[in-house]
Amino acid sequence: MNSDISTRIKKSLCSGTVLLATVLLFSSGSAVAQEEKRSTSAETLLDEITVSARRREERLLDQPMSIAAITGEQMQVQGIYSIDQASKFVPNVTLTSDDRANNTRVVIRGIGGGFPDPVFVFGSGMYVDGHYVPTSLGGYMSTVDIERIELLRGPQGTLFGKNVTGGLVNIISKKPQPEFDSSVLVRLAEDGQQDIRGMVNVPFSDTVFGRFSAASEQFDGYYYNQNLGVDSGGKDSKSFRAAIRYQPNANWTIDASGLVSRKRDDNLGGQCQNNLRDAPQWGGGDGNLERRLYVGAREDFFAICDADVAAGDFVHSSEKVTFSDVDEEIFQLGVQWDSDGPLGSLDNATIDFKASYRDMQYNYFADRDYSRWPIDAIGTGSTDGQNNETFGFELLFEADVNDRLRFTVGANYFDETAFNGSNTCYDLFVGNGASGQVTCQDTGLHFELVPDNPNSVFIDPTQAADLWPNAPRINGGGPGPFGGEVSVWNKSTGIFGHMTYDFNEDWTLDVGARWTEDDREFHNFEFASTGCDVGLDPQNMCAYTLETSLFQVNDSGFFNQEAATFSEVTPMLSLTRNLASGDMLQSGMFYFLYSEGFLTGGFNTEVNANIPEGGPNLSYGPENVKNYEVGFKGQFMDGRVQVMADVFFMDYTDQQKSFELQNNDGIYGTEDPVELVTNIASSSISGVELELRGSFWDGGFVSFDLGYIKNEYDDYSYEDPANPGTIIDRTQFLINDFTPDMSINLAVEHEFQLSGGASITPRLNMNWQDEYEWAAETGDWPKDAPKSGCHQDAYTTVDARVTYRPSKGDWQMAAFGGNITDERYIEFCEADRNVWLWLSLIHI
């Protein structure tokens, strides 16, 4: 195998320079508020945290499960301004992005991922105020007015349901309060970073309170497009949230909120390199440049790549202006009734009803070859792109039966509708009985690829100037396009229960179970087009005139539709040994946890349903994970030290993995062989997680986080469909889990008291990541293979922050630098299906 690569490099805000942030906090000026503003960051980081991981509010240190929680105040102290930045402080959690802007990748304990196609789901999920976010699209939220984020590791199938086999990220917003409060944050940084956030909390009466927040966050980007002469990779995000709380008495609380956000970002920058010679043969794959264009086109392309690399890490020559636009609205209603005393034979009873709605519109255009040639681009144009609409309902009832027994029961319903495109071509095609020719203009997903020359093997080199003009190409509309539409409908129902029983002061038992039924349906239509006749936007791509027939679809596209129902029961059990306080120990526990989770089944999009051979491969079943975990949680030295640690083993079965199917006759489209997905593998995941927080000396604070994970296939073998009796074994291949084997994060700070009562607190944070083979993303890199061009050696980043707090006044100022040693490391690297392998580096 060849380890040659092409490169996409990414850095974060700081580039080794010092940035400046100013936080102005205005409050009602009560004595309590003043005391909180003057507290040290160490006290903030050791504050008791209340979480709702078991669907009721409990202390973090009382939860018999692996969970990390970070409050809004703690995020401010640690310099966390976006949800994805939290993963640096949480072992075995990876929050990053895919190769396209605003496409999130959530991976917990080696399970998860992210891809924009609405058909695909992944094993680690995200919730926003109780609403499940089923798609990876939308980008990570900023931390504007966030109460806390909870990161739950391990299967959460009992209380949260499907698609959280690795774990989940639970985001909780701040609720309106009865006292006036307000805050403003201004954050300035290099590369045009300008963030402004504001919040005001207003009590309208003794029973009605309102909370309003807004944010504008801008960033110019750190890539330079030397072909177009512009910066790229920039971001422009604006959001507004309004929340109202009505508390007519001690029994009732009614919350209503709405969040509207608009993101107008560039797509992620990148770089190609003259390193790879054996990329997959698809689109403009290695060798296809010369077959489809002219003798020498391949070397000309790599010469351009070399010129970009020589110009610097953050230089590329894309011929297109790319974008990633996301419009998002979330509306939520919560009604809670509290018995405020006995309810018949029960006590402390609570009924909680939640309803939520989310609408997300996504349009993008990405140049995947990063060169001045129109080799490979993908996008939705600027009209009907991808729309994801979801709504959900949940009803919870919890109560105490007696001093020893507590329970929670509930039911939920979730509905998702997702469209990639307007469905015009699909509807016309079906309306004509899938046989007559259809002419339509669609606005779904489009690809622009290297064209085929139908008349000869090689194009005359003298035509090269006409095919690949050297002048910048701002207009899209590259050659050889094809496109597709995808429609997805999901309906999910769940019934669940959880019980906690205290045998005595020392021992506690928790048991629970959930039944989930998931109804899924999808339509997929992929087609070739005959031209690019109507310009949608002169800076992006154009609309294609589509002439679709049954022969054309079978020959070079796909038409399929399928529906399936998947149901599972996911139990859990934990046994907790509570420890008595002693000379050093303030509180503590040991626990054993068994839990299960399942990832719902799915569909192979690139199969023609109207061909008999395609039927058996249209769908595949759920994945299942069983988790065995032993952990410890405790407080020492009068609460000045906190320790949370666990060891886990997860049995991962029925994994949805790809297998190769020979396609000489083109039944499965134009690729040969074609990769399809089925339940074909199993693996074992084991690891350790350790989190230590301590104020070991007056004014000082230390945090230490360690994560270790071992993720290997137990079996990944299957019979070769083209050669019965021949077994293809991939068991010794690496797993693309986007997680290093080991990670360590160490932070140290000390508060120095200045004359007059002011203070200054320097903070140093070191993060070490073990080596990682990103070539595993392609799914075909053996463990014993030489290091690929996508291999990431172990590396260390160092962040610094200095915070000034005055003796009086509700404000503070911080100067900070990220990656002050200017370390370069890979954010993402994969084999593109065209000409090369590309990677993304970060240099924060």
What are these regions (language model features)?
Residues 121-123, 135, 144-147, 153, ...:
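Outer-membrane beta-barrel translocator/receptor signature
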